[in-house]
Amino acid sequence: MKYILVTGGVLSGIGKGITSSSTGLLLQCAGYKVTAVKIDPYLNVDAGTMNPYEHGEVFVMTDGSEVDLDLGNYERFLSCNLTKDHNITTGKVFKNVIEKERHGDYLGQTVQIIPHVVREIVDGILNAAKDADADICMVELGGTVGDIESMPFMEAVRLLGRLEGKENVMVIHTTLVPVVGAVGEQKTKPTQHSVKELQGLGIRPDIIVGRSSTKLEEDIATKIAFFADIPRECVISAPDARSIYDVPMVFLEQKLPELVEERLGLKPKKPDLTKWEDFAERISNGKKNVEIALIGKYTDLKDSYISHEESLRYAGALLDCKVKIRWIEAPDLEDSGNTKTLEGVNGVLVPGGFGSRGAEGKIMSAKWARENKIPYLGVCFGFQLATVEFARNVLGLKNANSAELDPDGQHSVIDILPEQEDVKDMGATMRLGDHEVIISGGVAKELYKNGTIFERHRHRYEINPKYIDQIEASGMKYTGRDKSGRRMEILELEGHPYFMASQFHPEFKSRPDAPSPLHFGLVKAALDHKKSG
């Protein structure tokens, strides 16, 4: 097993995840089996209870674990399904160590950061890699070098090299090379300090990826190589790209796979990026275009809906179409009381969410799409609120609502799941992960081309069974249900060009070569709507 550790310096959010994903993709396209681990040095056990404004989208994996959005990036780039073991947090590590101490596993030792916590981190990496049965494990360490919360993980990086052998472990350090002043001069000083800090921890980077708005100038790259004590060719330039999907080609041009193979003693293999290059070209150069409104409550941070954004782009690439997203804050719709900001869009997407803030704005958008025959896709909360809107304005149940929003409401067409009634804890307690969905027909079966599917879930509420017959008699059909037939999973509206919604999250299984069928259907319907004028 080979391990590639990806660290970051200067500041967070400069592209460690893309560096790691792109490197993994290149090696995968060369024929290696690649897996990935993301380390998050925060005290939360997982990302499940975090506000999207804190870390962006909460990504749900097949096994139901709620993790950092970077894991979604790995799944999309590597076309794989990861598990809870591939996300290591400080909270999870401390929890495991304390439980072992209480259980007596340390046989009376004084439990300390070194060796116990550090060893727990290393064991987590080794177990995740072993379970994946991979040739290479990419390990991304969140945060930046020098952060106090990252120190145990930096020590774990050093220890991993000693335990597994230096020939099996390498470090790629991603750092910022800012461009300063009107003359556009690239500065190396932040990188110098970052590398010095890393070396002071006993970790020597093998490759440095320099993030900058422009390609690294030759003298700048040479200077970085000199003070980092690495060959010039081991300094990789990572300028701003047309899209993140162009980054693997940028790295390939600079022979990154060859550098990795040489450092880790791997047999040289040439990556075949033919399909990926075609995809990257299509995602950036669609001949057609549509605009879809995304009605959210965290739209100031686009990463809150990154899986939806990428799902729409993947669908567009397959349809030779560029998808423009009109980001609309649901509370703004609510406050204004009108839907003028929706005018001119070719489709509407209402994603998942929780709580009353913005709920009425989402209901307004579902009503507008239904009445104006604009293609609509609702997901999770968007599925539930489409049902609330239909109950209010078609069935005439004026007080219809979700029990989440109005616990004492007269018509709770959305009710809490029976198994959730006595749940008190918030973390990892929802109906999560892959569940079977049986599709009986309709547009859903045309899109999925299958009567049985498995999709990822994250919810506490469901359609109230008492109202299903009444709703279906009025034209809203539930064409997807769980295997018991009692839990509603997919709805579609009769007589509408495309009005679909799902209780599950189709965006989490969307891949570059296989976009979510429901997102594909939305983009296709949006194109048809635009064409019909």
Located regions from the model:
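Acidic/polar loop patches that form or flank catalytic/metal-binding clefts of enzymes
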Residues: 207, 269-272, 377-378, 397-404, ...
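Flexible phosphate-sensing "switch/lid" loops adjacent to ATP/NTP-binding sites
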Residues: 1-323, 330-347, 354-355, 362-368, ...
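A generic structural signal for well-ordered coil/turn residues at beta-strand boundaries
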Residues: 204, 231, 288, 344, ...
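Cysteine-nucleophile active-site neighborhood
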Residues: 17, 21-25, 341-435, 441-443, ...
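Active-site proximal loops enriched in glycine and acidic residues that flank catalytic Cys/His/Asp
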Residues: 8, 38, 212, 239, ...
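Glycine-rich, charge-decorated loop segments at or immediately adjacent to ligand/cofactor-binding or catalytic sites
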Residues: 180-187, 384-393, 493
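C-terminal and late-domain segments of enzyme folds
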Residues: 432, 436, 442-533
